[in-house]
Amino acid sequence: MNLIDAAQHTATAGLPDLVRAAQGGDSMAMAELLDALAPYVARLCGPIALDDGADAAQEALITIFTSIGQLREPAALFGWVRVIAIREAVRVAKKAHRAATTELQDVPARGDPQLASDVRDVLRRLAPDHRAILVLRDLEGLDEQTVSDMLAVSAGTAKSRLHRARRRFRQEWDR
């Protein structure tokens, strides 16, 4: 079970009920739902949108707020939220059109703080599309088809983009 799965597992108790209440117009339930989702959305948006991660997370939460009625199955909440967050993060990162110069915040450190810092430095130098695919495949652990669906690209495009992103990451790592 990866870090995200563990966080989802501990945070999901009662969320389907909150979703249904929010869909029914309960503003308190909506506020509680958005509060529960905010850290997850921020973890997804940060590594992709970098210094604009907070803006991307806010835009994603707004989309969740305005579109909650479109979620057909409350049990699919995290998958639905993940799609929204990733798309917003990529959109915001592309819109920025500038090199990221601030620290990447939400890459989990596994043991060695220097290694985590080095990984953040390399990710900072990658294009938003490359960061997105690396986060989804290598941090989130999603399969190629799910990633291609989330990024609205063909499976072949996702596979080649992942290959290029990993190659670019290795090149930057070796610098």
Residue ranges and their predicted role:
Residues T66-E73, V83-E103, D112:
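Arg/Lys-rich amphipathic alpha helix in sigma70-family domain 2
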